Amino acid sequence: MIVFSDMDGTLLTSDNQMSDATWAMLDELARRGIEFVPCTGRPLSGIFEPILAHPAVHYAVCANGASVWQLDDGTPTDTSRATRILSRPLDRAIAHRVHSIAAGHDVTFDIFADGQCFLPRSLYTRLDEFCGGDPHIAASLKRTRTPIDMDIDSKIDEVETLERIAMYWHDPADRDAIAAELDTLGGIEVTRSYAMNIEVMGEGATKGTALTWLCEHLGERLADAWAFGDNINDIPMLQAAGHGMAMINAEPEDREAADAITEYDNDHDGVARTIMAALA
């Protein structure tokens, strides 16, 4: 058995907390020697340190599968010491093209690179406008992003490994126009993790391809893999795992793609209850 789980809307409660039952599940997985792998759109630096420090956690799938990290054994919370063991980067020329598309619209522009997420300060200060009025989403975005004072194209050129791009919008017309232009580009994967965003990765970078690769790397059978998710970017891993579990609070597309649906939502220990029942 190996367990992969999305963070936001899945493992974490709606106010971005870890419940006692979820910690107890991780403790039981560690006791049994079962790997728990955060599988998230977040950068590595955006995963809560107590999760990275837990003895059940040695790997993390980040940026929607663009990077798979192995944590440092001695200091797992020091993300600068983690080793990237799989990389499916976004081509810089494509990233510049995506920026040129976005520049004509009122959207944010997140640069996920080198295990971090960078956002121009002028957009960072406006994040509340792009979160659909949800203060918990706004708080999460602010916590996982580093505001920068350099221009976007220069930052794209400066980073070592470009993982993905994210754009948050508040006018559906901007979403539709950007999506239409992205459809004309090759070499990318397009998805979303919230109703109000668009996420762009390099071709072949999905949570599903990362899950498949890590299972092979660790000698785990896909049939023994459990995956939990709630949004569109989770669908590839729900389809790849032998036990693809959509949260009961998941998008309809996830519930359609999954092998089963959890009995409880993310605010009522849906992941923990399902895994503990499977271990019983």
Model-assigned labels for residue ranges:
Residues M1-M7, A24-D27, R31, E220:
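Non-catalytic pre-domain segments flanking phosphatase-related domains
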